[in-house]
Curated annotation (Swiss-Prot):
Its EC number is 2.7.7.6. This is DNA-directed RNA polymerase subunit gamma. It holds the Pfam family RNA_pol_Rpb1_2. HAMAP family: RNApol_bact_RpoC1. One of its GO terms (cellular component) is DNA-directed RNA polymerase complex. Its cofactor is Mg(2+); Zn(2+). In cyanobacteria the RNAP catalytic core is composed of 2 alpha, 1 beta, 1 beta', 1 gamma and 1 omega subunit. When a sigma factor is associated with the core the holoenzyme is formed, which can initiate transcription. Mg(2+) binds at residues 466, 468, 470. It comes from Cyanothece sp. (strain PCC 7425 / ATCC 29141). DNA-dependent RNA polymerase catalyzes the transcription of DNA into RNA using the four ribonucleoside triphosphates as substrates.
Length: 622
């Protein structure tokens, strides 16, 4: 099958005419036979397990079920490419054509498109300038509508009539002395189609513009709304009566598959059930029309056909929802398209990409701000091509297959090579929803055990992340350019300020604030090690780690730097035998020699405050 490449700027969705729907599904075979219309509700033959002809999986309409093989088996193999079998009429080609070849169902009676009837706003009701309730009554055979009042004095165009009113008028028309002529009334989608066909869009638009100029308030707003719809129909070249369907497209069979399960049973797409309902009711209606069945029976069948098509297009939009086994609502065409799991958002706007992973995030308090903890299991998958390349380059293996075998065996050498590979190779972390540019940032990966991604707590506000089960995605930039860009522009430590406000977005919160408070808090109660003197801050930390002092105990530590304090009062002065003078303040001790020169300074603090101060000094490299 030749590949067709065509560049386009955008996709536009509009109304399809009946001719265009036929064109999608109709094909002419070399023998002149036109195929494309699905006329039977059958799917596959339960004995041969082959698709039924003219059914929902017909090979003549949609293409062969097996590559290069016709339905009857006369032609097999690729050498018969392009031949159409004289016996079964199936073209010998690839089976993948069943993913794009369409069919169609020719309806025995027109039906309205439920989107245009029941949508908000209802375009059908807006165009006809009628209340939606009235249009619904016509469509679902609850009321007649006057299509042509003729010479009847009390009838008006588009007037609704009940069954009794119409019988009364009918009696008047067919009475012997009747003068009434040209009176036409209709019911169902056919009547709505006729009303839409009678609309002259250009004339209607001109009349509306004139009326808008002299109107005010709510009436003017209503007229503008109607004019906007009419202008859109004119601009797109669509006809209003195309909102009433006479032909329904049947989507390709591989997009609504039927799969055989282990026990011999079949699992099928809900669409097949919905299409089957439409075909059954359509065939029944055609048969009733052929045998000239009573009008009431035909009308009931038309209503049922309308409901079947409604369920196919948008199940549950109007009337009772069609359910399958276990009372589960069947998924209609609309359900497949719309929502988060729909075709657009799931498959077209968002796709799965290579070199990416996803896992739950947990806090990594020992990480630096530009680092993230990447699980080994995930890292070896993401960086596998790089690891294989390095293994071959270092001569540890000879080929890719041997390298993969080494990785599968979890050989210890793999982790050493992986450490070398990820060193200096940033990864991108993204948390959905990405509402601003800081929703995706670069980090240097650090290999960790477990299966959770570790994240520095300071970058949480930028991602709007917390650790109650949030998940994040990891992406690996492959090219040198993308790695450089990630390092220079996207590294977390380079994104301190919010792009929206210019204020710092990296601010400590919750656990960090509580931790800082706990470290620096004072406890007036007596604690272990209280009043002890230490020669340096390192001695204090060592004593705390050995359990000799508690975190909040008041201790004295020698400190030679400047100290800001509130000791304004006069100190208590002590003099030792060797002539040294000590000034005693509430929060510090100053010792001077005989010449008044400061020898040492001890300050009153807690191990917690020393640890806090020491950590900040080390991180700032003071």
């Amino acid at each position: 099958m030749p590949k067709l490449e065509q560049r386009f700027d955008y996709v536009k969705i509009g109304l399809a005419s009946p001719d265009r729907i036929r064109l999608w599904g109709e094909r002419t075979l070399p023998n002149g036979q036109v195929v494309g219309e699905v006329t039977k509700p059958e799917t596959i033959n339960y004995r041969t397990l082959k698709p039924e002809m003219d059914g929902l999986f017909c090979e003549r309409i949609f293409g062969p079920a097996k590559d290069w093989e016709c339905h009857c088996g006369k032609y097999k193999r690729v050498r018969h490419r392009g031949i159409v079998c004289e016996r079964c009429g199936v073209e010998v080609t690839e089976s993948r054509v069943r993913r794009h070849r369409m069919g169609y169902i020719k309806l025995a009676a027109p039906v309205t498109h439920v989107w245009y009837l029941k949508g908000i706003p209802s375009y059908m009701a807006t165009l006809l300038d009628m209340p939606l309730r009235d249009v619904e009554q016509i469509v679902y055979f609850n009321a007649y509508v006057v299509l042509n009042p003729g010479n009847h004095e009390s009838l008006t165009y588009k007037q609704l009539l009940s069954e009794d009113q119409w019988i009364e008028i009918e009696d008047q028309i067919y009475s012997e002395d009747s003068q009434l002529v040209d009176i036409e009334v209709g019911i169902g989608a056919e009547a709505v189609q006729r009303l839409l066909q009678d609309l002259e869009l250009e004339t209607e638009a001109e009349a509306l513009r004139s009326e808008i100029d002299v109107s005010k308030g709510q009436k003017r707003a209503k007229l503008i709304k109607r004019l906007r719809v009419i202008d859109n129909f004119i601009a797109t070249g669509s006809r209003p009566d195309w909102m009433v369907l006479t032909v329904i497209p049947v989507i390709p069979p591989d997009l609504r598959p039927m799969v055989q399960l282990d026990g011999g049973r079949f699992a099928t797409s809900d669409l097949n059930d919905l299409y089957r309902r439409v075909i059954n009711r359509n065939n029944r209606l055609a048969r009733l029309q052929e045998i000239l069945a009573p009008e009431i029976i035909v009308r009931n069948e038309k209503r049922m056909l309308q409901e079947a098509v409604d369920a196919l297009i948008d199940n549950g939009r109007r009337g009772r929802t069609v359910v399958g086994a276990n009372n589960r609502p069947l998924k209609s065409l609309s359900d497949i398209i719309e929502g988060k799991q729909g075709r657009f958002r799931q498959n077209l706007l968002g796709k799965r990409v290579d070199y990416s992973g996803r896992s739950v995030i947990v806090v990594g308090p020992k990480l630096k701000m530009h680092q993230c903890g990447l699980p080994r299991e995930m890292a070896i998958e993401l960086f596998q091509p790089f690891v294989i390349h390095r293994l071959i380059r270092q001569g540890l293996v000879n080929n890719i297959k041997a390298a993969k075998r080494l990785i599968q065996r979890n050989d210890p050498i793999i982790w050493e090579v992986l450490e070398e590979v990820i060193d200096g190779h940033p990864v991108l972390l993204n948390r959905a929803p990405t509402l601003h540019r800081l929703g995706i940032q670069a980090f240097e990966p650090i290999l960790v055990d477990g299966r959770a991604i570790q994240l520095h707590p300071l970058v949480c506000p930028a991602f709007n992340a917390d650790f109650d089960g949030d998940q994040m995605a990891v992406h690996v930039p492959l090219s040198i350019e993308s790695q450089a860009e990630a390092r220079l522009l996207m590294l977390a430590s380079n994104n301190i300020l919010s792009p929206a406000t210019g204020k710092p977005i990296v601010t400590p919160s919750q656990d960090m604030v509580l931790g800082c408070y706990y470290l620096t808090a004072e406890n007036p109660k007596s604690q272990q090690g209280e009043g002890t003197y230490f020669a340096s801050m390192n001695d204090v930390v060592m004593a705390y780690e050995q359990g000799q002092v508690e975190l909040h105990a008041f201790i004295w530590v020698r400190y030679d730097g400047e100290v800001e304090d509130d000791d304004k009062g006069e100190p208590e002065i002590q003099t030792s035998g060797d002539g040294l003078v000590t000034h005693l303040y509430p929060s510090k001790r100053l010792r001077f020699d005989q010449d008044g020169k400061l020898i040492s300074q001890y300050i009153r603090t807690t191990p917690g405050r020393i640890i806090y101060n020491k950590t900040i000094q080390e991180s700032l490299a003071i």
